[in-house]
C-alpha cells in the first residue's frame, strides 16, 4: 500500500506542476495595441510675467511637459532667471517682438528693429540659437517677412484665453477642438490660462496626446521649417504673411 501511495505521489507531482504552469500562463494579461500617439504644441505669448509664468513652469515640470514661449523683449530684463529656467528645463523660446508691435504697420526699419532687438537679448542671455518668431496678432508685412531669417509661427487653435479669463471655458475650448498636429495659442500672464493649460494636459494625455515644443512637433511631422515662412500648423502655411 505504501508503495502504491509513493507511486501515486510521484505521478501527482508533475501533474500539479503542470497545472500550476497553466494557471500562471492564464494569469498573464494580454495588452491590446495602443492607438498612435498624437502630438500638439502648447505655445504661450506675452511673457515672461511675474508669478504666473513661474507657476506654469512648475506645473509643466511636474508633468514633464515641454512648451514653447514667445517672449516680449522689454519684459525679459526683469525676469532673466525665469527665462534661463525655461531654457534649462527644455522649453523652446521664441521672439514676440520687443514691445508687442503690429508688424504690418509703421516704419519698415522700426518693424525689423523690434524683432532684432529681442533676438539680440535672447542671444546675449541664452547664447546663439534659432529663436522662432510669432508676430503679435499674427500680422506681418510682406516687406518685413522677407527680412526674417527664422521660421514664423501662427496657430491653429486659438483659445482666446485673454478674452475668456475663465479656466473652465478655456479648457473646454481646447478639449472640444484639439486635433493631432495643432499649435495651441495661450498667454501665460493670466492665472486662468495656467490653470486651464495644466488641466487640459492631464485630460488629453489620457486620450493619447503628447505635448511637445514646436521644433519637436515639426520634426515628428516630418516638416523642415523654412525661414521667413509663416506656419499655421506643420502641414499648413499662411497664404500671405500680410493677411489680417
Model-derived features with residue positions:
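Active-site beta->alpha N-cap acidic-glycine motif
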Residues: 24-106, 110-117, 121, 128-129, ...
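Catalytic domains of cell-wall/extracellular-matrix polysaccharide-remodeling enzymes
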Residues: 55, 101-210, 215-232
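Conserved Rossmann-like nucleotide-binding pocket used by diverse enzymes
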Residues: 17, 94, 153
Amino acid at each position: 500500500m505504501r508503495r502504491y501511495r509513493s507511486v501515486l505521489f510521484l505521478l501527482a507531482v508533475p501533474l500539479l506542476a503542470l497545472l500550476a504552469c497553466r494557471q500562471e500562463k492564464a494569469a498573464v494579461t494580454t495588452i491590446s495595441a495602443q492607438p498612435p500617439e498624437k502630438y500638439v504644441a502648447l505655445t504661450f505669448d506675452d511673457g515672461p510675467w511675474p508669478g504666473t509664468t513661474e507657476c506654469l513652469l512648475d506645473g509643466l515640470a511636474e508633468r514633464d511637459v515641454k512648451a514653447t514661449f514667445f517672449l516680449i523683449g522689454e519684459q525679459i530684463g526683469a525676469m532673466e532667471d525665469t527665462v534661463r529656467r525655461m531654457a534649462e528645463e527644455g522649453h523652446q523660446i521664441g521672439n514676440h517682438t520687443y514691445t508687442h508691435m503690429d508688424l504690418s504697420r509703421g516704419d519698415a526699419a522700426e518693424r525689423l528693429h523690434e524683432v532684432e532687438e529681442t533676438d539680440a537679448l535672447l542671444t546675449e542671455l541664452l547664447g546663439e540659437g534659432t529663436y522662432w518668431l510669432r508676430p503679435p496678432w499674427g500680422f506681418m508685412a510682406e516687406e518685413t517677412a522677407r527680412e526674417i531669417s527664422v521660421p514664423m509661427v501662427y496657430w491653429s487653435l486659438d483659445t482666446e484665453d485673454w478674452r475668456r479669463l475663465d479656466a473652465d471655458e478655456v479648457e473646454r475650448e481646447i478639449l472640444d477642438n484639439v486635433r493631432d498636429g495643432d499649435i495651441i495659442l495661450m498667454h501665460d500672464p493670466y492665472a486662468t490660462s495656467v490653470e486651464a493649460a495644466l488641466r487640459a494636459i492631464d485630460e488629453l494625455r489620457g486620450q493619447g496626446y503628447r505635448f511637445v515644443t514646436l521644433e519637436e512637433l515639426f520634426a515628428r511631422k516630418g516638416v523642415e521649417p523654412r525661414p521667413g515662412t509663416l506656419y499655421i500648423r506643420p502641414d499648413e502655411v499662411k497664404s500671405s504673411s500680410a493677411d489680417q
